[in-house]
Amino acid sequence: MTTDKTTCAVRHDSGLGKECVDCRIRGAPWPAQCHPGSMCPFAHRTMGIHRFFRGNPSFGTRCATPEWPDRVRRAAAARAHPYYASELLHDPDRHVRRQAVKRAPLGQILPLREDACALVRVAVARRLFGSDLIIMMDDPDLTVRRIVASRVTTHMLPLMLGDNDPHVRRVLARRIDASWLTVLAEDPTADVRAIVAGRLQWAVSAMCSD
């Protein structure tokens, strides 16, 4: 068995095992750079699958279709063409949807702001800005709300002042307009109050220097 990275067709002619002879990738009209086990869509380890699609991104779209095993489709979706990624946004597999969100056009991912899976919503929040994130301000997932607090425009931040997560309020204390800082001045979390105090002190110093 050869150990050189080469095309599937060459390895087949070199006498590899049945798993390579029957490989659907090998039957494609275009060659793929692969290696059994370490750079293969059917590798036992996920790393080997991802390595294959990193080396052969053109196979991402072709191998994200439903007839492929889920673990193959999840890795393939990360390399799928952005226009095909739109079709994967409604895939039953949450990991495929999450990868599709990262590649699909922004206008296509808006409905997934209310996806049942928090991982998918996190991926959505990391791509959107401003008013597109308003409906995610009350998301039940803490990570989603933290991302939202860091990406909405500052004039929207007062809408999140009642959040019960101190991490969200820390972001608010750093970003919110100074006119709202007094609302957070008596926050139950010490470091939130410290951030507010630091900003207020700076504001007073700036006024005195003028």
Task: Report the location of each language-model feature.
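Alpha-helical scaffold segments
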Residues: 1-210
